[in-house]
Amino acid sequence: MNVDLVVAGSGFFGLTVAERCAAGLGLRVLVLDRRGHIGGNAYSEAEPETGIEVHRYGAHLFHTSNRRVWDYANRFTAFTGYRHRVYSTYKGRVYSMPINLGTICEYFGRVFAPDEARALIAAQAAEVRAPANLEEQAISLIGRPLYEAFIRGYTAKQWQTDPRDLPAEIITRLPVRYTFDNRYFNDTYEGLPVDGYTAWLERMADHPRIEVRLKTDFLDLRDDLVGNVPVVYTGPLDEYFGHSEGELGWRTLDFEMEVLPTGDFQGTPVMNYADEDVPYTRIHEFRHFHPEREHYPADKTVIMREYSRAAARGDEPYYPVNTPADRARLLAYRELAGREDGVLFGGRLGTYQYLDMHMAIASALSMVDNRLRPHFAGAARPNNRPGGSGGPSPRPRPRGGADE
């Protein structure tokens, strides 16, 4: 095979590695993806009836405070001035998220000064001193009233489990802002790609030394590749090793898309549904991500209802569950990965951690700098093959959205 590096997966991690190795190191790179499109879960496409850009795998919002990542992304796309804001419905009323001073005033029906709100939440949170489950942990952070309104039902739908039966460690913090700032992210840089995610990702792959093969499963070719050419693998870690140490637990998402005969369904890009008797967790309305696009129809809109559940084998894995059993399996898989000659493991699936897009790019740049560049610079030396898991990873964290 006349290539210097094989990358399994064409998401942000894989394409960043491929682009940097091709453009920065002069390598011939083959990118393989089992799907029929480029871009992993960031893939977007125009809904055919309306032309509205839809994020097929749930809303993806780009944000970062990493200047290097921002500068790198801007090589391939310009960004809009979009700033993400989220609202939640509960018992027929709408509140801004994450919980902020406006949310507190709206929910309790009076005006609070910041110090008054802090004192109120502290008093309500004092109900629980030694949390033994997720419900008690959440109450110890924000108090029972706000927990019952915005966390309990939403969490039960996410995990398909009563929060009293979930471990406390799932939630380590619940941000509360004692200002009226209702921006979802606090990063220095934020926006959406002007031409969409797929155009951005295609530009990353558009290099004469990069070949992309879609509908091609790396695992079908593994025996021919591993040991003969260096590999960066971004697929599921447990699947690479044939689930020999057991399956790593994931949550998955199901989506229900609908074209509606109205120019505006909900007035905002994302609406959470905190009531437990509403089966979906949130609704996306994609036209609101790009209000600057004048070609969107005035009489039609596209919505996507999102449902959360435990992933079974064959489902698309989104969020690591990260139980104690999962962490034990992960350690075993990391040991196997460290002994895998000529293979580096990276990305969300390859390291069993939740990665926002900017985190995936940063991690890929680090792999190129610290593993691949030194390897190929010293490729003439014997026994100098990249291998292993790429170093320890931060603990996965559960999140409420596809890529926030």
Which residues does each predicted region cover?
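Short, well-ordered alpha-helices that flank and scaffold nucleotide-derived cofactor binding pockets
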Residues: 19, 23, 206, 366-369, ...
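Conserved flavin/dinucleotide-binding core of flavoenzymes
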Residues: 46, 284-391, 395-399, 403-404
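Dinucleotide-binding Rossmann-like beta1-alpha1 core, especially the glycine-rich loop
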Residues: 49-124
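Mid-domain catalytic core of redox enzymes
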Residues: 24, 216-338
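Beta1/beta-strand and adjacent pyrophosphate-binding region of the FAD-binding site
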Residues: 1-13, 30
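Conserved beta-strand segments of alpha/beta enzyme cores
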Residues: 28, 53, 78, 209-213, ...
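Glycine-rich FAD pyrophosphate-binding loop
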Residues: 19-48
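Active-site/ligand-binding neighborhood in enzyme catalytic cores
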Residues: 91-96, 101-230, 241
